[in-house]
Each structure stands twice: as structure tokens, then as C-alpha cells.
Amino acid sequence: MSMSIDSNKLLLRKGDMKLDNYPTCAVEALTRLETLIASRNKQNMVMQIISEFIFLERTPKDGDVRKSQALPISQMNLFQEFQLIIALIEYFSRPGRDATRNAIFLSLFGSHLTPQRSKLLSRLISTAVSGSVAPLLSSAGTWMQQVGCKTPLSLEVAQNIVSDFISYSRKTPEQLKQLPMVGPHFAANFMVAVADLYLNEQRSPTLNPPPDALLDTITEWMMENPTLCQASQQPLVLPAGAIAMPFTTPLAGLLRWVVLAPLVSNRSAYSNLHLSLLRALQQLVSSGESTALPSQDLMQIVKSLQSYCARLAESKTDPQADAAYQKCMERFAQAVQIALSSNCITNQIQLLCLLESLPPHKLMKIVIEAHKK
């Protein structure tokens, strides 16, 4: 169906926006967007259609300067949200080009969302996980990379998945366990985000471990497929002219988990995850400017260990006699050794110098001396 528009108004009529016509108008709008989205000079029109006919957002009148600076307000009720989620699931499940699907998804959910769109996005992705909707999860993985896996939007999506499938579920659903096979790129980017939520002193003054079921799920993913972390390096399928944002692998965040875990937990799952990460590092092939283990992420681990050692000093405990610290350093040294050998750490000398500032550990000392030459 062609999309003809005069200079003042869209072909889609206001009368089409009656509640009894929803979500028909949203479905029609999605179809029409496919022909518009390739035209760079029609992006404002695309955004207007999305806001008005898909999300039912009301924009304040231009005459009121104060109101015009406010975010558009969605007039959708819960039932209409449910209808839209079903319509989007069906739309993204249709045969079509990945580039078109990704362009539509990025237009629907950009990097600056209203609270209503953000909540709907989280519900949409959880529904896609529950229904194993591979095409939508593929687009969601692309979206996460484009907006940043550690941005508040991506973290909200990750936290919502944890809440839906872990926190409020007695048993981890099979759909979540099978996620790497259904949507490997999304699963890898989900791990980047969720790893940032736990055992991270930049987000909480205390080291909060991940829920046991989440740890077990990610450990199972990594044990079955150590190369899953590399799925985030897959080339993105974007519309013409779009620039792919740098990828981030989950390796650094998960490494922080296993290194710092002895300070708060003695679960054996961390040992299994550690071994899987070592295998993943061994299989890693560094390419381009984006490396698997940015030194600043590893330095964050060092700072957490320094803080722990400072607390040990206050209690007059020798780090060499502290079993938790020794276990942390053993895991850290093993990972650093393999990562350095694989040449996948940036600013290696700076990292080695910072590692020397930690209380001495026999294995780490050997690693530092071997690579500082």
C-alpha cells in the first residue's frame, strides 16, 4: 500500500485512531513504515507515525513552550499495550529482510525513550524470550549494541528479564535456558548487561551476588558453549548509511563475578563458570580495535580487591593468610595469563603496574614478571 502525504497531514486519518480500530492502525502503520524508513529525509514523518499511530502518544501543543519541551504522553491502556505487544511479535515473526526489521525496531525504540515506551519494550522482549521469537530477539540484540549494553535502557531490559524469569519463578523456564540457541547475539548482549548489575561496586557500595538461578543459567550457557561470548562480535545488519556501534563482550563482567565471588560466596557454580571463561579466552581471536577485555574493566576488579585488602588491614589480617583473597587472586592470575597470551587486553603495561600494587600473590607475581619484560 503506498503512502501519500500532503504538506500538512498524513494520509492516515485521525478517525482511524478510534479505540475500536486499535491495533489495526498500528499494524497498518508498521507496514507503511517499511517504505518510508529508507528515506532519510522522511525521518520526522516516521517518528510522527510511530508516536501517534503505534504508541498513541499525545504531544503537547506547540503554542505552549513549557509543555512542548515535555515528553509525549501515551494514552494507551493495559489492554492496548497487550494488543501492541502481540502485533509486534506477529510483525517481527513475518518473513522479511533483517535490515528492515532492525531499522523498524531501532525506530520504535531508540536511545531516548519515554517511561511508557521503555516499560513496553521490556515487556515485549520478555514476551519474545518466553515465546522463543528468534527474529525479534535478533533485532533486540542489535538494539542493545546500538544503544549500549550498559546504558540504563539495556540494564532495565536485563533487570526485567531477571525479574520475570528468575526472581518470580520457582524454576528457571526452559525458554531462558534455550535463549543462546534461539538468539545468541541477544543472549551475549544480555550477559553484558546483567553482569554489570551484580558484584559491581560501581553500582552498589556492597558486593551483591547474582541470584543463584541466574548464576546457574549463565554457567550452563557458558559450559555448553564457551564461544557464546563472541556472538556479540557478529556484524550487525543495519539499514544503508547506519553506523554500527562497537561491540562489548560479556567476558570482563563475568570475569569480575568469578574473581570477586569468593569474597561473598562459596558456590561451586563460580568455579565452573571460571573454567568456562578460561576456555573462552583460549579460543578468543582478537580483531580490530575492540578487544575482549578492556583494561579499565580489569582495573575495576583490582580496585575492588584493593578495597577488600584495606578492610583486612583495618582488622589486622594478613591478605596472604586470607583464604578468600588468595582464591580471588588465583582465579585472577589464571585469567590474566591466558588473556595476555591471547593478546586481548588493552593497555597491558598499565594493568600490570596496577596489579603490582596488590598484596603479593605467588602466581600473579609470576604472570606479571613473565609479561612485563
Swiss-Prot record:
UniProt key word Nucleus: yes
Cellular component, GO annotation: integrator complex; nucleus
One Pfam family this sequence matches: INTS15
Keyword Nucleus: yes
Top-level taxonomic group: Eukaryota
InterPro entries from the UniProt entry: INTS15 (IPR027844)
Subunit structure: Belongs to the multiprotein complex Integrator, at least composed of IntS1, IntS2, IntS3, IntS4, omd/IntS5, IntS6, defl/IntS7, IntS8, IntS9, IntS10, IntS11, IntS12, asun/IntS13, IntS14 and IntS15. The core complex associates with protein phosphatase 2A subunits mts/PP2A and Pp2A-29B, to form the Integrator-PP2A (INTAC) complex.
Family label: Belongs to the Integrator subunit 15 family.
Name of this protein: Integrator complex subunit 15
Top-level taxonomy: Eukaryota, Metazoa, Ecdysozoa, Arthropoda, Hexapoda
Gene: IntS15
